[in-house]
Amino acid sequence: MKTLLLTLVVVTIVCLDFGYARTCLKTPEVKSEPCPPGQEVCYTKAWRDRMCSFRGKVIELGCAATCPRQEPGKEITCCSTDDCNTHP
């Protein structure tokens, strides 16, 4: 009986994924990092600033609890799988 109980406990621990965290690419390093608890959405924000003609669009990558709101002049895309917010 104890062996059966121990087996069930081991199987439960192996099957459950304790501590899983979504991973998203984050700037400025454009590096995959785990998101804080509760943040399951990866996002990409792109916009033009005064230096755009020299360096191109400003890109921000990160994690959020929900997709950030659209803002005038900013392109925002969201996804919900690991490292899905690739650098454009």
UniProtKB/Swiss-Prot annotation:
PROSITE patterns, A to Z: SNAKE_TOXIN
GO molecular function, one term: ion channel regulator activity
Tissue expression summary: Expressed by the venom gland.
Keyword Coiled coil: no
Disulfide bonds: C24-C42, C35-C63, C67-C78, C79-C84
Main location: secreted
A Gene Ontology cellular-component term: extracellular region
Record's keyword terms, sorted: Acetylcholine receptor inhibiting toxin, Disulfide bond, Ion channel impairing toxin, Neurotoxin, Postsynaptic neurotoxin, Secreted, Signal, Toxin
Location within or outside the cell: Secreted
Superkingdom of source: Eukaryota
Range of residues in the leader sequence: 1-21
Function as written in the Swiss-Prot or TrEMBL entry: Binds with high affinity to muscular nicotinic acetylcholine receptors (nAChRs), whereas it binds with a low affinity to neuronal alpha-7/CHRNA7 nAChRs.
Miscellaneous comment as given in the Swiss-Prot or TrEMBL entry: Has the length of long neurotoxins, but only 4 disulfide bonds, as short neurotoxins.
UniProt similarity note: Belongs to the three-finger toxin family. Long-chain subfamily. Type II alpha-neurotoxin sub-subfamily.
Name recorded for this polypeptide: Long neurotoxin LNTX-2
Upper classification of the organism: Eukaryota, Metazoa, Chordata, Craniata, Vertebrata
